[in-house]
Each structure stands twice: as structure tokens, then as C-alpha cells.
């Protein structure tokens, strides 16, 4: 059964009526209301298109968090072959919130990083809801070093509310691990492409997104803090999260305008959760285009282009 967000109620009602009419139409009793069903389906699709063409930043945040939205594991299955995960940071342990692997992307050998939130109670706990600990970011550095050593492009898929803020994580050097991961990404001699597929929260996101090309799915969000966190700090009132989301400029459209991301990946009407296969295919095409634009650059040119990209952020605001 499809899960609807609160603001999708008008669409939900129309689609419920479509299902009711389909149930009434039976070939056995000669009743056919196909024309009426088709007309109502058209209205529902039109309502959905209009709704998603004018989503507020807060509504986009809810879409980015939709429980049925495709996660890293879904993208990994749809985009890569010969996917071979690597475990552990060689210092403390394994962190399943951040996955690292060797793989092939459309026949080309690559390294892959990505946050995994999980889709069931069991997997969400195992992956810590996509909130990586220091060992996750140290594993990311390890993957980046392997990418550099073997001359493999790096593809990162970002989907996290932020790095895990627990006491143990802080004791093991969370801030240092994030900083080193960000630095490693900026210093890579191979091309790297990052895609924000859902939430891109704070340093936990940018730690694997310091890339030559940064892409965002159409209804993803990318920010220094969650809207709820910003509202709590600024107004001491989490109910103002919608206002915070608007003021923070967290949408792909705003961030493209500011030069923080390089391109937007169009999602199916109604969001990636309505047609994960199409969303994943569009993401793959965007990654291929981004990687193609970086092909042929030597290590020095790759680093210079990346450095220039990040130094330019904010100059035209």
C-alpha cells in the first residue's frame, strides 16, 4: 500500500477513488467504467504534477525523508555490477552506516561510497539510520586512498541526516574523522562525483561530497543542519522548522543557483519513491555525464579544478 505524506492528501483522495472504481468494474457482471477511471486517473496525475511543481522547502525535506525513497542499497543494485564491499577502518572497527566498495559502473572500474539508512526496523538499527561514526569516515578515507592508488574514479551517494553525535563517537574523534575525510576528498588525484540522493546533512554529508562534480536529486535537501535543529537553535522552538527550511535555502534549485551543486537530477513526478527504477536510471545517466566531463584530466588538473570549484562558492551570492 502506498504511503502518503500529509501534504499529498488531495492526491491520496483522488487515487483512492480510482481504486474504488476499479474494484467496482468487473468483467463478470458486464460493468465497465474504464472511461471514468481513465478520467479520474488523469485528474490525479495532474494534481500530483501541480503539487510537486511547487513544493515548499519543508515539503521537499519530507519527500527526501520518505520511507519508500530509494536508499544507497537500491542505487547500488541498480547502478553497479561486481559490487565488492570493503569493511573496517583498520583502526577501530566497522561502521555499516557508511558503505565503501569496489565496483563497475557501466563497465568502468570505480570506487563507491554511500550512506545507508536502512528500510526496515532491523536494517535501520544496523545501519544507524545512515548516521556514520568516526570509523565510517576513516573507512571512507581508506577507500579514497585505494581509489588514488589504483587510479579509480570515486562515486559517492549522500543520504544522511548528519554524522552520529553520540558520546562514543565524540570520544573517538568524530570531528577529526570528518575533517580528514573532507580533506582526503579535496586532495584526490582521480575524478570524484557526489550525488545527494536524499538528505545531505552537515559535515556528515560533505565528508564524502568534496567532489569535482556535486549533483542533487530534484527533491533532495543539502544543508549545514536540519530544519528542526536550526529552529531549535535560532528560536528555541522546533515547530518553526518550516520557516527554518525556507530561510536556509536547502533545496537543489537554490543550491544550483548559488553554485554549490553542479546539476540537478530530475525525479519522476511525485518523487523518486513513486518510481525508484526511473530515478536510479536518471541518476546513472547524470553520473555518466559528469564523469565524462572529467575524462582525460591528469591528477594535477583534477585537483586544480576541484579546488577552483570550492573556492568559487560564495563569490557570486
Swiss-Prot record:
SUPFAM superfamilies: ClpP/crotonase. Pfam families: ACCA. InterPro entries: Acetyl_CoA_COase_a_su (IPR001095), ClpP/crotonase-like_dom_sf (IPR029045), COA_CT_C (IPR011763). Its EC number is 2.1.3.15. Residues 39-293 form the CoA carboxyltransferase C-terminal domain. The keyword Transferase applies. GO terms for cellular component: acetyl-CoA carboxylase complex. HAMAP family: AcetylCoA_CT_alpha. PANTHER family: ACETYL-COENZYME A CARBOXYLASE CARBOXYL TRANSFERASE SUBUNIT ALPHA, ACETYL-COENZYME A CARBOXYLASE CARBOXYL TRANSFERASE SUBUNIT ALPHA, CHLOROPLASTIC. NCBIfam families: accA, AccA_sub, PRK05724.1. Acetyl-CoA carboxylase is a heterohexamer composed of biotin carboxyl carrier protein (AccB), biotin carboxylase (AccC) and two subunits each of ACCase subunit alpha (AccA) and ACCase subunit beta (AccD). This is Acetyl-coenzyme A carboxylase carboxyl transferase subunit alpha. It comes from Azorhizobium caulinodans (strain ATCC 43989 / DSM 5975 / JCM 20966 / LMG 6465 / NBRC 14845 / NCIMB 13405 / ORS 571). The gene is accA.
